[in-house]
Amino acid sequence: MTFDTSAYVRLDTLQSLGTSASGASLATSTGDIFEVSCYGPGAFRLRVGPSTKPDYGLVVGRAKPCEVAQGEGGAWKFTAGETTLELAATPLRFRLLHRGAPVAGSITDEHFRGWTRLPSFGRVRQGGQWTAAFALASGEPVYGLGEKFGPLNKRGQLVHSWVVDALGVNTGLSYKNAPFAWSPGTGKGAWGVFVHTPATVTHGVGYPDWSHRSYVVHVDDEALDLFLFAADTPAGIIDLYTQLTGRPASVPMWGLGLWVSRAYYKTPEEAAEVAAKLRAHKIPCDVLTLDGRAAWKVETRVDFEWDPDRFPNPRAALAAIKAHDLRICVWEYPYVWVHSPLFADLASRGYLLTTADGDPYVFGWDTTPGTSPFGKVLTPLPESAIVDFTHPGAYVWWRDAHAALFADGVDVIKSDFGEQVPDDAVAFNGDDGRRLHNVYPLLYNQCVFEATAKFQRDRDVAPMVWGRAGWTGSQRYPIQWGGDPQSDWEGLAASIRGGLSWGMSGVPYHSSDIGGFYGSQQPSPELYLRWLQATVFSSHIRVHGIGEREPWAFGADTEAIARKWLAFRYRLIPYLQRVIAEAVATGMPVMRAMALAFPGNTLTRSYETQFMCGDALLVAPVIQPGGEVEVALPPGAWYDLISRQRFPGQRVLRYKAALDQFPVFGREGYALPMGFAVQHTGEIDPAKPLEQLWVFGRPTRPLQGLLQANIVEASDGTFAIGAAADVKVELFGDAAGIVVAKLTT
C-alpha cells in the first residue's frame, strides 16, 4: 500500500477561537477547526473535522479541567497533572511530556527540503480521509491494535483495523480489532494513541514503505479524532484507555471452569451422554455447548426455535444435561434465513439492514469449491438477512427473543460471527455499512449480554457471553474467544499471541479452542495436552473443534494428564478471581505479555508466547513437539512449580518438560491462593474456598481480601503470613525465620 502525500493538505497555523476549562478550539489555515480537550491527567483529545455521524458510544469518559496557556507564534500548552501537551504551528505538530520529559511527538522524518516526509496532521483534499504521523525512536516497540496473531511488537508492520471473519489465525486478518496502540517508550514514560472512529484505520507502524521511523495512521472517516495518553508504565496507559472506553465487567465464577464443546453434538441424547461421561471419567467441567448445528435447523436459523425433530421437548432435553451439574451454552448468529417466517416479519418492521433501494440486504456465504470454508461436517450456511441493531425496536426485539431460551434452561449464549456487514448496506440510524461494519459486533454482543442479564436465572451473578468478533468497547461485554485456529503447533502459538495482543489492547479476558478448530487431521495427543496446559492459565478455558475434543478421545494416558491439569485449573480459581478483580478495576488482562508485565526488560519482551498469569505466575507454553522450551526469566527469582527449584532471574533457561509437566514459575515475594480440586464450581464453598497458600520465598507484597489467609506488612517493613487452621501454607525456598500465624475465621 502506497501513501500519496500529494493527495493531502497539511494543517498549519493555530488561531484561537476560544478556550474552555478543558481545552481550546483553534482555527487552521485550511479552515478546519482543531479542538483540544483534556480527559483527566494523562489523556488529551485532538479532534478536527465535522462530527455529524453516529459515534456508537465508544467513549464513555468525559472532558475534565486542565491548565490552558497560549504562547507565541501559535503555540499552545495544555497541562493536566504530570502530563503536558504542547502544540506548535506551521506545520501543526505536537509534543507530549510526562513528568517533564518528552514521551511522544509528531513525525520527525524530514524531506530534504525541510518538510516532514508525511503530514503530521493532514486530510485528503476532497475530504473524508485523514492522517496523523508520530515519531518513533530507533528500536521503540509498539503494541496493541486488537487481537493480532503475528508478532506482538507491531513495529515494521502495516496493520488494518478492520473486523473480518479471519477463517483462522494464520494471517493479519482478525476477528477483534481496536485502533489503540501503545509503546513503553524509551525510558522516560509510556505513551498511547486511540483513534476514535468506527471506520477503517490503517496503521503504518514504522512501516518501511512509508517511514521506518514513524507511526502513521490513516483514517477513512469524516473526522480525525485522536486520544493521546501518557503514563509511567504501559499498565497506566491501559488504565487510562479503559477509563475512557469502559471498564471490563466481571464474570461469573462458573465461567472460569472448563467449557466442553465440539462441532457438533448431533442430538441432545449425544450431548447428555457426553455430560454423563464427563462425570463418570472425573473430568472437571462447568459448561457444555450446543454449537451451531446442534440446536437449530440450519435452514431456518436463527429463529429462536429449537429444531422440533431433535428437540420435541427442549426443557426435558436440557434438564438431562443439567442434571450432571453443568451449565448450557447455545450458539447463535445475528442473521435470519431468507425463507424463515421471521424474515418477512422483521423486514416489514424495518428491523433488517437494507440496500440503498430499501430492500432487505441479503448476505450470501462463499460456497465456491476451493475457497468455501464449508464441507461435509460444517455444511453451507443459508442466504440470510442481517439484523439492524441500530434500530431501537430491532435491538429490543432481538434481546427479548432470548427469553424463552433462558426459560428452557440455557445459561449463556455463544454469540458467534458478526463480521459480515457489507460496505453498501444501509442502517436505520443513517450510517452505511462501511462505518457500521466494525462496531456491529459490539452492538450485537451488547444486545446478547443485556439479554443474559435480563433473563438468566442466577440473578446474583454477573452475565457473560462467549463472543468472537469485537471492537473498542468490547471489554464491557465479556468474553471473547480467538476464533477458529488450525489444529497444529503454529495454530497454538498464534492463538497465544492473539490472546496476548487482545489483552494488550485493553481487554482482560480471552480463550481459544483447545486442540484447534480445524485441520487436515485431528490434533495429536501431545498437541492437545500442550494446548490445554497453556490455556489453564488463560482467563477462560474451552475444548472445541471439528470432531471430538473431550479428553478421553485421545487415549487413557492423555485423559489422565488432562484430568491432572484441569484439577489444577480449578485449584487456581481463587487466584484467578483476584486477578479478575484487578482487571475490573484497572483493565489489566489476566494473560500479560512480557512487554506489558516487564516493559523495561529487553530480554524478556522478545519472548512473545510466554506470559504472566496475573502478577505471580510466569507461564512458558510448549509450542513445539518434544517438550523443549526456552524460558526468559525476568528480574528477581522464580520457583519452578513442578520441582520447587529456585532460579535467579534475568537469564534464559532451557527447559525440558515431560508430557505431564509444564513450565510454570512462581514469582519470589508473591503468594498463590489455591483452592480445592473439585468437579465443578458448585462444589466450592464460598466461606472456605482455600485449601493451601503457596508462598514463593519471603513475601514482599501484601495479600488481602481473602477469608482464610492474608499477608500484611509489619511496622518494620517485613511481611507476616496469616492462615486459618484449615489452610496449609506451602513455603517455597528457604523457610528459616518465616512465621505463619493462625487466623480465626
Q: What are these model-predicted stretches?
A:
Residues 1-245, 249-255, 260-263, 268-276, ...:
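N-terminal accessory segment at the very beginning of proteins
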Residues 156-159, 174-177, 272, 395, ...:
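Short, hydrophobic/amphipathic alpha-helical packing segments
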Residues 89-91, 173-175, 188, 219-221, ...:
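Short, solvent-exposed loop/turn segments at the edges of secondary structure
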Residues 450-455, 463, 470-480, 491-494, ...:
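Catalytic core of carbohydrate-active enzymes
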Residues 30-31, 72-73, 79-81, 90, ...:
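Short, well-ordered loop/turn elements at secondary-structure boundaries
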Residues 51, 57, 281-562, 597-599:
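Aromatic- and carboxylate-enriched substrate-binding clefts and catalytic-loop regions
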Residues 92, 185-187, 198-200, 233, ...:
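Short, glycine-/Ser/Thr-/acidic-enriched flexible segments
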